[in-house]
Amino acid sequence: MKIVVPIMPTSLEEAQALELSRFEGADIIEWRADFLDKHSILTVAPAIFEKFAGFEIVFTIRTTREGGKIELTDGEYVTLIKDVAAIYSPDYIDFEYFTRKEVFDQMLGFSNLVLSYHNFEETPENLMELLSEMTNLTPRVVKVAVMPKNEQDVLDLMNFTRGFKAFNPEQEFVTMSMGKLGRLSRLAGDLVGSSWTFASLDNTSAPGQVALADMCRIREVLDAD
């Protein structure tokens, strides 16, 4: 299970001030570019990709449609992704599949997509159908983050993940149940077949994230013989 740490600079100065030593133990850096305005993303990008050249990087623009900070038209969303991809070739590119279906055909040439679905309100009853639709597109990663209302929601997500991984062993899945109630799902990735877990430094990018130092210790305990 790889540990992903999101970074959320709101300016070039904040990006330049990020201290690499604080990311010890992280495997992947997720750059949440939506904390910038759309005109600043390409200005800040060189600082991000140069500083974190030793890590795998997920480029994410989490828009307001799925709980993010920036509002973009479909055209602006795709153009920004393509511009950053052409210049910096991030290891992974997040794509908000269900809210951007109309322009998904423009992304078919990308082999490094993280097809994602985020629901900060609930765990939808049709979660299996959502997972199935994304899995059938065979992206690099299928990512689902949902909010539980009760313990059964958490267990359902974990069981669905395990089932889909069993039937699609070559497909990478990243799933999590958010908030305090869903925290167990962030720790049991190896058990259910979720490849990544997200950990935080100072600020969380989603409810229920565990601090990086704590997650490193938890992984060490879980990986011990």
UniProtKB/Swiss-Prot annotation:
InterPro entries found in the cross-reference section: Aldolase_TIM, DHquinase_I, Type-I_3-dehydroquinase
Domain of life of the native organism: Bacteria
Binding sites annotated in the UniProt record for 3-dehydroquinate: E30, W31, R32, R62, R186, S205, Q209
GO biological process: 3,4-dihydroxybenzoate biosynthetic process; amino acid biosynthetic process; aromatic amino acid family biosynthetic process; chorismate biosynthetic process
Enzyme class: lyase
EC numbers: 4.2.1.10
Active-site residues from the entry: H118 (proton donor/acceptor), K143 (schiff-base intermediate with substrate)
Catalysed reactions, as listed in the record: 3-dehydroquinate = 3-dehydroshikimate + H2O
GO molecular function term, any single one: 3-dehydroquinate dehydratase activity
Keywords: Amino-acid biosynthesis, Aromatic amino acid biosynthesis, Lyase, Schiff base
One protein family per Pfam: DHquinase_I
Subunit field text: Homodimer.
Functional summary from the UniProt entry: Involved in the third step of the chorismate pathway, which leads to the biosynthesis of aromatic amino acids. Catalyzes the cis-dehydration of 3-dehydroquinate (DHQ) and introduces the first double bond of the aromatic ring to yield 3-dehydroshikimate.
Family stated for the protein in its record: Belongs to the type-I 3-dehydroquinase family.
Descriptive protein name: 3-dehydroquinate dehydratase
Organism annotation: Streptococcus thermophilus (strain ATCC BAA-250 / LMG 18311)
Lineage per the UniProt record: Bacteria, Bacillati, Bacillota, Bacilli, Lactobacillales
